[in-house]
């Protein structure tokens, strides 16, 4: 059978952009803990020796931005100046302002159910049945690799690891869409000066790659690229500046589904960039889990200040067991995609977001949008 290749990448919690995402979501969580109705748009910039936290916030809560930032950086593992970035000595600038009243009047309503969308925009949700979490395999295993890197760094199994790392996995697919195997694996990890390249390659292969990637997909032809430049001592915010919202493909489906362009981290649930993308994943996952399609991509769109979505469309890539018009009817009947409705449906007005800010927002069953609790209702209504 003819094969085609598809590649996705992930980055670790110590990557500069992910540091920024985690700080933004840590601030969001701290505010939501005190004020579930807060309006938050928190952006973070990190560079050598400095973190700047900005954005727009309307809330009755008071939170200690400096302490939240230092704790987040400390938990990631930047705790010594020889890494070029130290949680306890970096400068922290707070330039947060208030949300525009022009936006606020379009969002808030006397009847909460009529809450308008916080902005216009389009969002996509996706699911397929090639992994047990109904996510594409390339992004799923890219996340698993860098998550494993973090685990063996923090438990000192590989004490020379440092926080910054990237992974990339290329899968080969058969012409029928099934997985043929893994064609290539890339893992680059920051490390201390005192480890040899040979020890690093052996440690990464035996302790990170082999325990994570299923042997059934590996072969003598699988290619491995471990720290292919030969040296990765300078990393984190010294190597590159980091910004909130710059890893939107890592955060979602690894490029296998389309993306509306809006980032997630630092945004409260009134921002449909985030909440509607979560709801769209919830819809797509339940459609696939119900056996109504093997692959499902849903698009929703909104107008600022308007509650009802301006459009809903579904693409099943020829895998649907029922008509796509029926699927859209099922979505409208079983899922409330108005901003207030989806926030209530998924219980989003609570501090659950910092955990999403590294290793992907989807395919992790601890999050409410990963539930498959609509399966029976969808199957019954579809006549299956």
Curated annotation (Swiss-Prot):
List the InterPro entries.
Answer: ADOMET_SYNTHASE_CS (IPR022631), S-AdoMet_synt_C (IPR022630), S-AdoMet_synt_central (IPR022629), S-AdoMet_synt_N (IPR022628), S-AdoMet_synthetase (IPR002133), S-AdoMet_synthetase_sfam (IPR022636)
Q: What is this protein called?
A: S-adenosylmethionine synthase
Q: Which reaction does it catalyse?
A: L-methionine + ATP + H2O = S-adenosyl-L-methionine + phosphate + diphosphate
Report residue spans for region: Flexible loop.
99-109
Outline what the protein does. Catalyzes the formation of S-adenosylmethionine (AdoMet) from methionine and ATP. The overall synthetic reaction is composed of two sequential steps, AdoMet formation and the subsequent tripolyphosphate hydrolysis which occurs prior to release of AdoMet from the enzyme.
Q: Which family does it belong to?
A: Belongs to the AdoMet synthase family.
Source species:
Shewanella pealeana (strain ATCC 700345 / ANG-SQ1)
Q: Where does Mg(2+) bind?
A: 17
| Requisite cofactors | Mg(2+); K(+)
